[in-house]
UniProtKB/Swiss-Prot annotation:
GO molecular function: structural constituent of ribosome
Any one Pfam family match given in the protein's UniProt record, by short name: Ribosomal_L28
Organism of this sequence: Rhizobium etli (strain CIAT 652)
Domain of life: Bacteria
Protein name per its UniProtKB record: Large ribosomal subunit protein bL28
Keywords: Ribonucleoprotein, Ribosomal protein
GO annotation, cellular component aspect: cytosolic large ribosomal subunit
GO biological process: translation
Length: 99
């Protein structure tokens, strides 16, 4: 399992620890990933995703998983999140036609 957020694409970065004497040693900056279960209102299902804490805040800020995925670009989403986004778009389009 890779260390990449499924919603934002945030991944591991590399850099240096720099001491007071300016000695540099390589290090990795790991994203703060959490396993969370998010509920899709349009599909009435629960989905377990591995997302960063920042992405979780963004999901709540935008008003839920559906709103976040509809506003997000497909480039930064994982393949699983892209499929979920397409299902939500299809379901909301069907609901709009029926109404």
């Amino acid at each position: 399992m890779s260390r990449v957020c499924e919603l934002t694409g945030k991944a591991v970065l590399t850099g240096n620890n720099v001491s007071h004497a300016n000695n540099k040693t390589k290090r990795r900056f790991l994203p703060n990933l959490c396993q969370v279960t998010l509920i899709s209102d349009a599909l009435n299902q629960r989905y377990r995703l591995r997302v960063s804490a920042a992405a979780l805040r963004s999901v709540e800020h935008r008003g839920g998983l559906d709103a976040f995925l509809l506003k997000a670009s497909e480039n930064e989403l994982s393949m699983r999140a892209r499929l979920l986004r397409r299902q939500i778009v299809k379901k909301t389009a069907e609901a709009a036609v029926a109404a």
